[in-house]
Regions:
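Cross-family detector of peptidyl-prolyl cis-trans isomerase
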Residues: 2-146
Length: 146
C-alpha cells in the first residue's frame, strides 16, 4: 500500500468514526424529580389523561450550571411553526410530558424539568439527546379536546 493510500484509509476511518458516533457524553447534571413550574396560568378546563391536546414546545438539555438550567436547545415546534398534537397520558410522548402537562389549562405555559428516567433514559435519542440526560421543556398548551 502506498503512503497516499494509507493516509486516505486513515482519513476515511477517522471520518467514519465521527459520522457514526452519537452525541457527546452528558455532563449537565441530574434532575431528581419531575419539576412543574407554571410560567403563565391558562384558563378553562384543565387537561387530563385521554384529552387530545395541541402544544408548542422548546426543549433543551438540562444544565445545572446555567442560571435558567437550559443548556443546548435540541428541538422546538415553534421553530417549525407547527404545534404538536397528541393524546395525553397514552405513552405517545415521554412520560415526563404525560405526567407534567396534566392539569395545565388552555393558554398556560409551564416549564418542565425532567429526570432522565422520565425522558429518554439510558438510551438517549438519536444524535441530539445523550444517554442519561435530564431535560428542560417550555410547553404552551394551545388547545384541549375532551
Amino acid at each position: 500500500m502506498t503512503h497516499g493510500s494509507l493516509r486516505f484509509a486513515a482519513s476515511l476511518s477517522a471520518l467514519l468514526l465521527v459520522a457514526c458516533s452519537g452525541p457527546p457524553p452528558y455532563t449537565g447534571g441530574d434532575v431528581a424529580d419531575l419539576q412543574r413550574i407554571d410560567v403563565q396560568t391558562g384558563t378553562g378546563e384543565a387537561a387530563t389523561a385521554g384529552d387530545e391536546i395541541s402544544v408548542h414546545y422548546t426543549g433543551w438539555l438540562y444544565d445545572q450550571n446555567s442560571p435558567d438550567k437550559r443548556g443546548q436547545k435540541f428541538d422546538s415546534s415553534r421553530d417549525r411553526g407547527e404545534p404538536l398534537v397528541f393524546r395525553l397520558g397514552t405513552g405517545r410522548v415521554i412520560r415526563g410530558w404525560d405526567d407534567g402537562i396534566v392539569g395545565m389549562q388552555r393558554g398556560g405555559k409551564r416549564e418542565l424539568q425532567i429526570p432522565a428516567g422520565l425522558g429518554y433514559g439510558a438510551r438517549g435519542a438519536g444524535k441530539v439527546i445523550p444517554p442519561g440526560a435530564s431535560l428542560v421543556f417550555e410547553v404552551e398548551l394551545l388547545d384541549i379536546r375532551k
